């Protein structure tokens, strides 16, 4: 009787720990197969048949449609370069250059992956419309209050994520270019 009780307890404990670990990984993500460049994080294999099971579970849970490897790669950032969470009440500057790509988009999402509502109805920028300097670099202000130039309104939400999608790019495909790719810096410059 005691052996049966211990066996059942061990099975229940193993099930709870296994399901808990799976839930944590599917909801909070894992660093398995990630590519990190500064504050930007990508999972280049999510659009392939070689996707890891944790990323597959996360994709199934979120309903995300990942970019295929032949099409490009998506980078996301939830913190600035100093690892501070991106706060919609603060002024954040995204500046620099992007890796070589035929086309890219930079979009603002809330923590649940939805576009952030704002009065301007501007949700992002593309490589075609962003204003650049003579050297090809850009400076984008992400803030709740209006700013001159490239401004992306946050609507004053507390936390948000930035998604940089690069189309037709060698980043994420060619192993030599991955960690050396130039990515825009993300800097929090002021909070009210």
Task: Indicate residue ranges for each PLM-predicted region.
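A compositional/structural signature for long, glycine/proline-rich flexible linkers
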Residues: 1-192
């Amino acid at each position: 009787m005691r052996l049966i009780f211990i066996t059942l307890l061990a099975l229940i404990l193993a099930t709870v720990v296994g399901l808990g670990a799976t839930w944590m990984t599917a909801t909070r993500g894992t660093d398995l197969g990630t590519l990190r460049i500064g504050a930007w994080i990508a999972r280049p294999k999510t659009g392939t048949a070689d996707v890891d099971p944790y990323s597959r579970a996360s994709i199934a849970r979120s309903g995300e449609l990942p970019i295929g490897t032949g099409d490009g790669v998506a980078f996301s950032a939830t913190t600035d370069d100093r690892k501070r969470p991106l706060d919609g009440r603060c002024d954040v500057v995204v500046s620099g250059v992007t890796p070589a790509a035929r086309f890219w988009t930079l979009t603002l999402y809330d923590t649940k992956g939805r576009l952030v509502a704002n009065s301007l109805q501007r949700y992002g920028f593309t490589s075609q419309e962003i204003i650049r300097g003579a050297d090809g670099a850009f400076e984008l202000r992400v803030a709740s209050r209006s700013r001159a130039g490239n401004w992306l309104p946050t609507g004053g939400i507390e936390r948000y994520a930035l998604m940089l999608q690069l189309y037709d790019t060698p980043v994420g495909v060619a192993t030599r270019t991955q960690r050396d790719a130039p990515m825009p810096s993300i800097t929090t410059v002021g909070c009210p």
